[in-house]
């Protein structure tokens, strides 16, 4: 009878109603890195590093780039005869120049403050070319004879289209005094130059005067140039050199020229009609007849990700450049399906749901929730309130991280612009150093936040567990695996009250108390039964052993193997 009671009690315990707290799992293979671990598989992750581009030059927000093809910026602005297709250009979004364009300064020489001029162009989107000193106005000088075989056009000697090389006329070079007043509302880009002859004979042949000068003045510029006569190696068939200069003439300001020789005078100037974000990109790519919001020298990027690792130079609404190969933010939970039965590792910030052995693939409508079983059946149900709060929290965290890192990189970007102007030789090293630091910061922040996110999910599971535990109290038993075993019958309505936090503890406490006491009594009774059986077994075993020893002794005495003496 006692055995039957014990068996029934055990069966009753096995079939008790249960509710378990757990978390979502799926078939995801997405992995993230944390401070403590690498390649942690998670249910959801967000890649924040763009690695792809289209390999083409594209329009930027519908505006075409100015692709200089085989011409350099200097060749375009001065008017190299081989760059006639760029005499008048429409508005551009950015400028593309090859690394070594063939059509640069056709007459050998130098362009003063060339990098500074390029920097200026990175803030301009449109020029309008205007004539400021007509070529025909030089009546006392030869304005058409200043040509060179170094600048051919249609097989004949020619010269830059936008400046005039003035030569002596009738064996005389009268002193030039010319002024131009900028009556426009826009700034003007004005270019001029000086010719450095090969020897004194060339000097007098071209300009008559053996000693010459060029003076240029504005409200902000005071320049005096003299030719440097020297024997030089030939470049493009020329031993002479030309040096070009530029300035920005503000509205209502005037530029004054004075010279008695070697003067390369401006004919055209560029009215800056539109300023804005632009760039000069070194690229060999072809135009792709496409549109983008972000362009790099490697190709266009069309992405909403906050970072990319394609090229540090960009134009448009672009992700921020880092040197990383991988930046992935965890947005979901550790993906540990229950069937794997792997022990969860605790994180740096104290993961506290490690007692739950695995996630549920059957729960698909939330991150955290319940699994119940009773006489009416079993099933999964997500806790939507905690899931939504977690989603909002993770989303806000991701956005905060992105905004935080964007602000840092924008600040560095402005510093790089200043370095490019002032410390050109150190710019590359400084740029690499800053990028190394900010890349490290971005990677470290992602690792830290991934650790926090995973522990945040663990904490949410533990909070849900505590919510149930505080409701049930001693009406149920904690099984240690995230589950509770009821001491009373809990139908679907009862289960629902536990899930939504309205469980009525007093309603079930009496039934739970009786069942708890009955189970405790069965345990005590079964323990007493086992103690009696144990004593009986011990006595019986000892008696059987004594009988065997006595029988063996009598047998040995009867056959003489053992001598028995009775005193």
From Swiss-Prot:
Q: Name the species this protein comes from.
A: Influenza A virus (strain A/Chicken/Hong Kong/31.2/2002 H5N1 genotype X1)
Q: S-palmitoyl cysteine: lipidated where?
A: 557, 564, 567
Subunit-structure text: Homotrimer of disulfide-linked HA1-HA2.
**Primary location:** virion
**In this record, what's one Pfam family?**
Hemagglutinin
**Which InterPro entries has this protein been placed in?**
Capsid_hemagglutn, Hemagglutn_HA1_a/b_dom_sf, Hemagglutn_influenz_A, Hemagglutn_influenz_A/B
Membrane-spanning ranges: 532-552
Positions on the Extracellular side per record topology? 17-531
Molecular function terms, GO-annotated:
host cell surface receptor binding
Query: Could you tell me the keywords of this UniProt record?
Result: Clathrin- and caveolin-independent endocytosis of virus by host, Clathrin-mediated endocytosis of virus by host, Disulfide bond, Fusion of virus membrane with host endosomal membrane, Fusion of virus membrane with host membrane, Glycoprotein, Hemagglutinin, Host cell membrane, Host membrane, Host-virus interaction, Lipoprotein, Membrane, Palmitate, Signal, Transmembrane, Transmembrane helix, Viral attachment to host cell, Viral envelope protein, Viral penetration into host cytoplasm, Virion, Virus endocytosis by host, Virus entry into host cell
List the Cytoplasmic topological domains.
Answer: 553-567
Q: Which cysteines are joined by disulfide bonds?
A: 20-483, 71-83, 106-151, 294-318, 490-494
Q: Which residues form a coiled coil?
A: none
Which residues does UniProt assign to the signal peptide?
1-16
Name of the protein described by the UniProt record:
Hemagglutinin
Main function:
Binds to sialic acid-containing receptors on the cell surface, bringing about the attachment of the virus particle to the cell. This attachment induces virion internalization either through clathrin-dependent endocytosis or through clathrin- and caveolin-independent pathway. Plays a major role in the determination of host range restriction and virulence. Class I viral fusion protein. Responsible for penetration of the virus into the cell cytoplasm by mediating the fusion of the membrane of the endocytosed virus particle with the endosomal membrane.
GO terms for cellular component: host cell plasma membrane; membrane; viral envelope; virion membrane
Q: Where in the cell is it found?
A: Virion membrane; Host apical cell membrane
